[in-house]
Each structure stands twice: as C-alpha cells, then as structure tokens.
Amino acid sequence: MGSICVSFAQNCLKNYKAYIKSKTMKKLIKVTLLVFLIFGISSCMMDGVKGDGNVVINKRKISNDFVRINASRGLDIYITKSKHTSLEVEADENLQELITTEVRDGTLHITATKNIWGSSTKKVHVSADFINEIKVSSGAEVYSENTFSSDKLVINASSGANANMDLIVGDLRCEGSSGSGMKLTGEAVEFSVSASSGSNIDAYRLSARNCDANATSGSNIKVRVTETFVAKATSGAGINYKGHPKHAEKSKNSGGSVNSTEG
C-alpha cells in the first residue's frame, strides 16, 4: 500500500497547478496529499522491498492470446505496436520474482506481489499487434514506444496512475480518476473523455474530429477538436479546448469551467 500512496501523491502534486480551480477543492486536496505522503512513505519503507541494483532483463513466455492490458502497483509499462508478440521484464534481479505477468481471460495482468521501493528500474516491455483496452492503477505508468493504431481503444487510469500514448484510433474512450494523469498525442475520429477526483487529461496534441468531454471534482481536461464538441464541467473542474469546432455545446455549474484557449 505504501508505494501506491506515494505514487498517487506524487502524481497529484505534479499535476496540481493544472487542475485545481476552486479554493475549497484546493484545501481538501492539500490535506489529502499530505496524509497520503506521510502514511504512504512510512508504510513503503517498512513493508517494501528495495532493489539490489543489479538490473537484468527477463524474457517471459506468453501462454495465451490477449487483447487487454491491466497494470498496477507502480510498474512502468512500455507498449510497442508490432506483429510479433513478446514480453520482457527489466528490473533489479531480486525484484524479478515479485513482478508477475499472467494472461487470464484475454487480459495480460501485470503487477507486483509486494511493494517495491528504491529500484533501479521496474519496466515491463510489451509488444503486440492488437490491444483494445488498457487499464493502469495504483501508481502504474504506461507509455507507447511507437504510434499505436487501432479501430477502437479504451484507456482507464486511476489511483495516481499515468498514461502517455501516441495514437491513431477510430473510436477512443478515456477515463481518468483519483489523481491520475494522461498525456495523449495523435489522431482520433471519435473521442469520449471523462475525468474526476483531481485527475488531469492533456490531449491538446491529439486531434479529434468529434469529442464528448465530461469533467468533475477538481479534474482538468484539455482537448483539440475540429467538428463537434460537447463539454460538461462541474464541481471545480475545468475543460479547455482548441481547434475551433464547427458545433459546440458547453455546460458548466458548481464552479466548473469550459473555455477556448484560442482567440
């Protein structure tokens, strides 16, 4: 639990200035982050496993096909679009047995059996041709090594997790919550995005034809849209957009804001 709390707090602090709008929300999140940092760090130091500094790469066998990825517990996932499926774990030698990779019901689950702190690296490299859903939680981070293309893709980040992806997608759906962050680049025809509980989604460099955005509870969304834009912001959340959409429907209440950042 310690490393999860630390990752959550660090990510919230990193995105703090971007998404805090209301004074009440600001005070609440300050207190929450302080609690997470104090208890998270102490718990992590007591219960976590420290890396031995000897980094090795372990090639893992993939027993079954998968179309989804679910990663957690502070691990860093690097995804490469490739016709050749492969899986490698790059981490301190004494941490290798703690990092588990298992395919169940079409989902590749990547996690750790114990808290990890002070590691030289804890990377999991995944190569696959087709992925339609990516979930990251509990301080995990996912990166695309090259442009990832798909007809449809769902990205879900929660509990201080991060997603940094370069995409070409027909139907893209993204959801961020609980202090998570996303940074997206590329193109999408249809883009549905929602953020809550202090999460931050930056898609200024992702050009969407049509976009439906919903932000609440001190979260922040940035998008670029060219055709149809529907936006709703509530409870101190903010939505900023670029791209001069031809049709825009904007709704805001309880301290929420929807603003164009272009003249």
Give residue ranges: language-model regions.
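Short, Lys/Arg-enriched N-terminal segments with co-localized hydrophobic residues
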Residues: 3-24
